[in-house]
Amino acid sequence: MPIRPLSVLTALLHVYIALRLLPALASLTPAWPLALVLLAVSAVTMPLPFVSRSHRADRKAKPAGETLHWIGLISMGWFSSLFVLTLVRDLGLLLAWLANALGGLQVPWDKVGPWSALAVLALATGVSLIGFVNARRTAGVKQVDVPIRGLPAALAGFTIAQLSDIHVGPTIRNGYIQR
């Protein structure tokens, strides 16, 4: 998908998140503009890793570009958690509204809305931090002996190395693999 339509789509999804969470947060905390700023930064920086793909040779000469690349990738991770959790919150609120409308549940909307919005932000941020820490830690090495019957003598002692779930790219490079 070309970058411009993708950028517009992700910006619109950020607007959706803002419309669903910020009004509820405004009734809970005066710090809600911080969430608005973070959403705006996320919307603006998410396209950066795709734009900078064509400028890989310049990265060593431009550390600011590398930093923006990282910010964009971190924004993507945070946005994905935030978007999914916002959808889950909306589904939960819809089910609570239906239960309330049918008379089976008394919902304290003045508490449920704001606190669930805050929970979405807190969970998305926490999950993103955990994901970032796990992605940056050194991958574990596990040695496994696999006996193979009928292996030719020429292959005795042969070692096979398998790298699993290590995605070498703009954030995980050769130095990480060498650790």
List each language-model region with its residue ranges.
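Non-catalytic terminal accessory segments
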Residues: 1-139
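Membrane-embedded segments
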Residues: 136-143, 147-179
